[in-house]
Amino acid sequence: MSITYKKAGVDIDEADKFVSMISPIVKTTFRKEVLTEIGLFAGLFKFDVKKYKEPVLVSGTDGVGTKLKIAFEADKHDTVGIDLVAMCVNDILTVGAEPLFFLDYFATGKLNAAKATEVIKGIVQGCKEAGCALIGGETAELPRFYKKNEYDLAGFAVGVVDRKEIIDGSSIKEGDVFIGVASSGLHSNGFSLARKVLFDIGKLRIDQYIPELNCILAKELLKPTEIYVKAYFALKDKVKVKGMAHITGGGIPGNLSRILPKNITAILDKNSWTVPSIFHLIKNIGKINEAEMFKVFNMGIGYIFVVEQNEIQKSLAILNKKGYKAYLIGKASKGGEDKITIK
C-alpha cells in the first residue's frame, strides 16, 4: 500500500475546502486599493500616495497568547480572530498610523475547515472594525506538532502615516494629561496567570456561572480585545494627540513608560476609572498584590491618549460620543524616581 500526503497527516482537500469557505467572507474586507484576488502568491495593495506629503509605512505583528486555551476549552472560536487584529492594529495606531491591510497565520495539527472558518470570521470582523483589508494569510497543517483540537495564531498589520504626523511621545511635557479608554476586560494579556488563579487555585469551571461577573466564565474571558482605531481618528483633527499607549503585557506601568520622555513621569489616580469585576475576582482568589495586578493586567484601561490640559473636556466628549468609556486618569509631571506612579 502506497503512502500519501493525507495518510501522513496533511489533507489538501480539507485545505481547499477551507479556502472556498472563507473566500467570500474575506472579500468583504477589501478596500478599493486591493488589486488581487484570493489565491495568488502575494497580496497587492495600492494606497493613494497623493493623500500624504511623505508617507511612512508602519508594521506590527502579534498573537493572542494563551487566551487561545480558553477558546479550546469552551469550543468557541469566533472571537479570537478579533483579538488577533486588535493586538496588531492597536500597536501600529500608537504612532498615528491608519491600518491598511492585514495578514494572518493559522497553524494546527489537523485542519478542521469549519472550526478554522470561525476563526477567520473573527479576523474579518476585526479588520472591518479597524478599516483594513485582509489580503492574505497562511494556513499550516502540521501533523503531531500541536495537541488535538488546538491551533496557534499570528497576525501582521501594515499601516501608513505622514512623516510629520508621526506620534512618538517626544513632545509630552509637564502638565499634559492622560486620557484612559476602557478595556473590554482582560483583552489578550495575562491569561497564563488568570488561568492559574481561576482554574488551578479557584477550581472554577469554564462553563460556570459567576455571580460577580453576571455571566459564565467563558463569556467573560473570551470578550474580544477592544479596537481603538476609531477612537484615535475621531480625535485626530480636533485634538492635539501627543502620545498613545496600548496597554498590553506589562500593564499600564510597562507600556505607558515606553512613550514618556526621559524627564517626564506619569502620576495616575487609580480611583478615576472603573476596574472591571474580573480583575477583582482574580486578585481575590489568587491573593495577588495590587502592584502585581497592575504589572500583569490592563486593569480596565486598554488605551491611553496624552493630550494638553485645555483639551480634556473636548477629548472626553469626542470619545464618549463615539461609544468609548473615557476617563481623565492622571497628569504628566517632571521626572522623579519612578516613571509611573499609580496612587
From Swiss-Prot:
Gene3D superfamilies: PurM-like C-terminal domain, PurM-like, N-terminal domain
Taxonomic lineage from the root: Bacteria, Pseudomonadati, Nitrospirota, Thermodesulfovibrionia, Thermodesulfovibrionales
Gene that encodes it: purM
Keywords: ATP-binding, Cytoplasm, Ligase, Nucleotide-binding, Purine biosynthesis
UniProt keyword Cytoplasm present: yes
GO molecular function, one term: ATP binding
Major localization class: cytoplasm
GO cellular component: cytosol
Protein source organism: Thermodesulfovibrio yellowstonii (strain ATCC 51303 / DSM 11347 / YP87)
Subcellular location: Cytoplasm
CDD domains, per the entry: PurM (cd02196)
Primary enzyme class: ligase
Catalytic activities: 2-formamido-N(1)-(5-O-phospho-beta-D-ribosyl)acetamidine + ATP = 5-amino-1-(5-phospho-beta-D-ribosyl)imidazole + ADP + phosphate + H(+)
Family: Belongs to the AIR synthase family.
Pathway(s) it belongs to: Purine metabolism; IMP biosynthesis via de novo pathway; 5-amino-1-(5-phospho-D-ribosyl)imidazole from N(2)-formyl-N(1)-(5-phospho-D-ribosyl)glycinamide: step 2/2
Name of the protein described by the UniProt record: Phosphoribosylformylglycinamidine cyclo-ligase
EC number per UniProt: 6.3.3.1
GO biological process entries: 'de novo' IMP biosynthetic process; adenine biosynthetic process; purine nucleotide biosynthetic process
